[in-house]
Amino acid sequence: MTFTDPIGDMFSRIRNGQMRSLNSVEIPSSNFRKNILEILKNEGYIKDYFIDKTENNKISLKVTLKYYEGDPVIKEIKRISKPGRRVYSRAASRPKVMNGLGLAILSTPKGVMSDEDARKNNIGGEIICRVF
């Protein structure tokens, strides 16, 4: 099965899993997705993720979703840069997400990182998504 936007598909699976109050969702594995999930885990938006091998010897990522008092921790996860329209930002011109309460994830020449880390390192890049 091919995807037009595998990152957008990952965000949809997380969003749909939280709407159904699932404990975890399964996502096809890739290094780029692992890097994004690592940032979401470090920032406290998901509990954890781990690599799972399915019966067809395909590797997938099992994401354990996080809730606070029954409500999903992620209120909004939105894809910014899409395959048909890439969005880039310089280090100086990047606004904060929800006045600093949210998070933007960027793909930079030094790897995938949060907007805060990119600002500290004075690096620009492609804005993958914003999370609040």
Q: What are the roles of these predicted feature ranges?
A:
Residues 1-132:
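Core subunits and conserved enzymes of cellular information-processing
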